C-alpha cells in the first residue's frame, strides 16, 4: 500500500507531462487545407439545406457537396440483440444555428423499440495521413508531418448534442439502434429528425425488420476479441492522478464499450515500459518491486489488484489477464533498491543468470498472490513479437517458477514453442496448419490472428475504408482462427480528437475509441463484423446439425472470400460490397 499511497498523495504534480487540458466536451476541429468544392458548386444545390440517407461505407468530405441521392425510407434488417448502423447526411449553403438530432421510438403495431435503444451522433472530422509512400503499410517514422499527405476525414462519433454547422459544409449524422433481445419480430418504423434555430426541421423515415433470431450477449460470443487497453493514456488526457477515483471514473465508460463488444482480455503491465515507451503515454509497472537491504525481494500488488478488480467487477471483462512482459524491447528491468534508496535497473537478457533470478523470484511470488486472489487460472505471462530463442529462455524461467503458468505470444509462428503457448496470435497472412490448429483446440488453447501497422489492407487507420474493420474480423473466422487481436484501442496521440497522426505509424493505428468516450466509424463497423462472426458461428452449428449441407456450403463459400487468396479470386472486390453481401446472406438464412 505504501507505493500507491505515495503516488496518490503526490497528485497532479506527479504528472509533469500534463501541461494542457484537452477537450472532453465540444471542440474546434483543425482546418482542412485540401482543395474542395467552391461557391460555384455549392450554389447549384436545389435547396439551401438538404438532409438525406447516405451509407455507412463512405467518409463524406466536410467541404464537398456529397454524392447522395434522395431516397425514401431506409430499410435495415437485424437479429434480436443486434446493433445496426445507418448514416444520414446534412449539407448546407448557409450556416446552421443550433442544429440538433432527435429520433422517435420505433413502432411495430403495439410493439415498441424505445428511443432509449437508439443513439444518434454528429460525425466529426479528424486529421489523418496516408500509407507509406510505396503503399506497403503504415509502419515507420513520421516525425515531420509535412512530408505526409494529410487531410480531414470523418470518423469521430461526437457526444455533443447541439452543433453550429458552417456554411458550405457537410455534416454527417450517425444512427445506431441496439435492438432489444426480447423484441417481437416484425417491421419497426421510426423517424430521424434534424432541426435548428434558423431552418425548418427535416425528417427521414427508417424501418428495421427484426428477424426471429437472437444474438447472445457479447460476453457469450464465441469470438475471442483482444484489444489492448492503455489506462495511462486516460490519466494524461483527463488530467487526473493515476489510479485515483477520478481515473477509474474516467476509464469506466471507455472500458465498458469494450465489454459491450465481447472483449475477453485485460491488458496489465508488470514492468516499466514493456514496449520502450513507443506510445504517447508509456505503460508503467502495475507491480512495485523492492530489493531489501538483506538482498531479499518484496512486491506490492496494490495497483495491479485495483486494475484487475475494476476490470472484472465493474467493467465485466473477466476471461484473461494478459501480463506484459518478460521480454521488453529494451532488456532493462526496474526495481526500488533499499540500499541506495532509489530506482535501479537490471540489464539482462533471457538465458542470463541475472534475468532468471530477477524474473524467477518474482514469478514465484506472483503465482502465490494470484492463487490467493483466485486469479491464477485466468492469468497469463504475455509477450509480443519476440525472437524464438528469447521466448524459449523466458518459457524455461516461467515453468521453473510455476509449471502451471499460462503463456501467451502475439508474434510469428514457431513450431518449437507453439505447444507451450496457451494463447498464440499470429500476423495477418499467416495460417496455422490444420493439424496444429486441431491439436491446439483439443488442448483448450487459443489461436488468433492480429493486424498492426504492417497491413495496407485490411486495417483500421483513420483513412482506411470503413468496411475494412468488419472485413478484418470476418477474415479471422474465414481463416479458421479463434478470434482477433489488435495492439491498441486507446493509446491516444497527443490530441486525439483533432489529430489522429502519430510520430511512428499511420494515423489512427494507436486507437479506435476517442476520449469522452466517443465511438468512431471504425469501431462501429468493427462491431458490425463481430456480430456477423457470431451469426456465422450460430448458423454453422445449426446447419450442420440439420444436415443442411447446401446452405452450409453456400455460407462457407461466401466466407472463403475473406482470406488473402479468396479476396484475390474476387478480383479484389471492394470490402464494402463483400461485407454487405455477407450481411445479407446471414440475414436471409
State what each model feature region is.
Residues 1-19:
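Bacterial Sec-dependent N-terminal signal peptides
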Residues 14-276, 376, 572-589:
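Mature N-terminal, pre-catalytic/accessory segment of carbohydrate-active enzymes
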Residues 80, 184, 249-250, 302-303, ...:
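Short, glycine/acidic-rich beta->alpha junctions
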Residues 148-149, 157, 178, 188-196, ...:
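Aromatic-lined carbohydrate-binding surfaces of glycoside hydrolases
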Residues 322, 406-408, 448:
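Structural detector of well-ordered beta-strand residues that form the stable sheet scaffold
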Residues 332-335, 343, 347-413, 481, ...:
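Catalytic domains of carbohydrate-active enzymes that cleave complex glycans
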Residues 408-431:
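Aromatic- and acid-rich polysaccharide-binding/catalytic face
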Residues 423-505:
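Catalytic-core region of carbohydrate-active enzymes that cleave or remodel glycosidic bonds
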Amino acid at each position: 500500500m505504501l507505493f500507491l499511497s505515495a503516488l496518490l498523495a503526490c497528485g497532479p504534480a506527479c504528472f509533469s507531462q500534463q501541461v494542457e487540458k484537452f477537450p472532453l466536451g465540444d471542440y474546434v476541429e483543425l482546418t482542412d487545407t485540401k482543395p474542395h468544392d467552391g461557391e460555384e458548386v455549392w450554389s447549384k444545390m436545389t435547396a439551401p439545406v438538404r438532409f438525406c440517407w447516405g451509407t455507412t461505407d463512405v467518409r463524406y468530405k466536410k467541404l464537398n457537396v456529397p454524392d447522395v441521392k434522395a431516397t425514401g425510407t431506409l430499410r435495415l434488417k437485424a437479429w434480436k440483440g443486434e446493433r445496426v448502423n445507418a448514416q444520414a447526411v446534412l449539407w448546407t449553403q448557409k450556416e446552421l444555428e443550433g442544429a440538433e438530432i432527435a429520433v422517435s421510438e420505433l413502432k411495430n403495431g403495439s410493439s415498441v423499440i424505445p428511443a432509449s435503444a437508439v443513439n444518434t451522433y454528429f460525425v466529426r472530422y479528424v486529421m489523418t495521413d496516408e500509407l507509406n509512400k510505396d503503399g506497403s503499410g503504415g509502419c515507420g517514422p513520421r516525425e515531420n508531418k509535412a512530408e505526409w499527405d494529410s487531410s480531414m476525414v470523418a470518423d469521430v462519433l461526437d457526444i455533443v448534442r447541439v452543433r453550429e454547422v458552417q456554411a458550405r459544409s457537410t455534416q454527417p449524422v450517425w444512427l445506431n439502434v441496439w435492438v432489444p433481445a426480447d423484441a417481437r419480430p416484425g417491421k419497426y418504423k421510426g423517424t430521424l429528425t434534424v432541426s435548428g434555430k434558423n431552418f425548418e426541421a427535416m425528417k427521414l423515415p427508417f424501418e428495421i425488420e427484426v428477424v426471429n433470431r437472437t444474438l447472445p450477449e457479447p460476453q457469450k460470443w464465441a469470438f475471442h476479441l483482444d484489444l489492448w487497453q492503455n489506462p495511462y493514456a486516460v490519466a494524461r488526457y483527463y488530467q487526473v492522478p493515476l489510479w485515483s477515483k477520478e481515473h477509474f471514473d474516467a476509464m469506466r465508460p471507455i472500458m465498458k464499450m469494450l465489454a459491450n463488444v465481447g472483449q475477453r482480455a485485460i491488458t496489465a503491465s508488470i514492468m516499466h515500459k514493456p514496449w520502450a515507451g513507443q506510445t504517447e503515454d508509456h505503460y508503467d509497472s502495475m507491480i512495485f518491486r523492492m530489493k531489501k537491504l538483506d538482498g531479499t525481494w518484496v512486491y506490492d500488488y496494490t495497483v495491479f489488484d485495483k486494475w484487475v478488480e475494476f476490470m472484472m467487477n465493474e467493467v465485466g471483462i473477466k476471461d484473461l489477464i494478459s501480463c506484459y512482459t518478460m521480454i521488453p524491447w529494451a532488456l532493462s528491468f526496474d526495481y526500488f533498491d533499499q540500499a541506495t534508496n532509489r530506482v535501479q535497473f537490471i540489464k539482462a537478457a533471457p538465458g542470463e543468470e541475472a534475468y532468471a533470478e530477477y524474473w524467477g523470484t518474482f514469478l514465484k511470488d506472483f503465482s502465490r498472490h494470484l492463487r490467493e486472489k483466485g486469479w491464477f487460472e485466468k492469468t497469463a505471462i504475455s509477450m509480443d513479437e519476440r525472437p524464438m530463442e528469447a521466448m524459449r529462455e523466458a518459457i524455461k524461467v516461467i515453468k521453473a517458477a510455476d509449471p502451471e503458468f499460462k503463456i501467451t505470444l502475439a508474434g510469428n509462428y514457431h513450431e518449437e514453442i507453439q505447444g507451450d503457448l496457451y494463447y498464440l496470435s499470429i500476423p495477418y497472412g499467416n495460417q496455422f496448419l490444420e493439424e496444429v490448429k486441431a491439436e491446439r483446440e483439443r488442448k483448450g488453447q487459443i489461436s488468433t490472428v492480429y493486424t498492426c501497422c504492417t497491413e495496407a489492407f485490411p486495417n483500421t487507420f483513420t483513412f482506411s475504408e470503413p468496411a475494412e474493420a468488419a472485413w478484418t474480423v470476418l477474415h479471422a473466422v474465414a481463416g479458421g482462427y479463434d478470434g482477433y487481436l489488435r495492439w491498441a484501442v486507446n493509446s491516444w496521440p497527443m490530441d486525439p480528437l483533432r489529430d489522429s497522426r502519430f510520430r511512428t505509424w499511420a494515423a489512427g493505428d494507436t486507437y479506435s475509441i476517442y476520449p469522452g468516450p466517443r465511438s468512431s466509424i471504425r469501431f462501429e463497423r468493427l462491431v458490425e463484423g463481430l456480430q456477423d462472426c457470431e451469426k456465422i458461428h450460430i448458423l454453422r452449428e445449426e446447419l450442420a446439425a440439420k444436415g443442411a449441407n447446401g446452405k452450409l456450403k453456400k455460407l462457407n463459400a461466401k466466407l472463403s472470400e475473406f482470406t488473402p487468396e479468396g479476396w484475390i479470386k474476387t478480383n479484389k472486390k471492394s470490402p464494402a460490397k463483400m461485407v454487405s453481401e455477407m450481411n445479407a446472406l446471414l440475414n436471409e438464412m
